[in-house]
């Protein structure tokens, strides 16, 4: 009796392994993979185009900046100070003037 159970278990195991490998290439699996790829691309695109996302790590007003590589916020520009800070020789972020 024990031998028959082992043989049946081995046959069922072999059939499960061979049939299980064929299911990976099924139309449902490929459709699911394509949908996940499309969702990932759309989700990433929405994150890049979102106007509600904050600008990160930018120098605010009166923060030192580099003239060659300004890191001021979008509402500021990198200018040389005209008043009390001109002797430092560095540039600072100032609010953009409306023209």
UniProtKB/Swiss-Prot annotation:
Domain notes: The presence of a 'disulfide through disulfide knot' structurally defines this protein as a knottin.
Protein name, UniProt field: U2-theraphotoxin-Lsp1a
Similarity comment text for this entry: Belongs to the neurotoxin 14 (magi-1) family. 08 (Ltx-4) subfamily.
Keywords: Cleavage on pair of basic residues, Disulfide bond, Knottin, Secreted, Signal, Toxin
Cleaved propeptide residues: 23-57
Described purpose of this protein according to its UniProt entry: Insecticidal neurotoxin.
Subcellular location: Secreted
Molecular function in Gene Ontology: sodium channel inhibitor activity; toxin activity
Disulfide bond sites: 58-73, 65-78, 72-93
Signal peptide start-end: 1-22
GO CC terms of this entry: extracellular region
Domain of life: Eukaryota
Tissue-by-tissue expression: Expressed by the venom gland.
A Pfam family recorded for this sequence: Toxin_22
UniProt keyword annotation of Disulfide bond present: yes
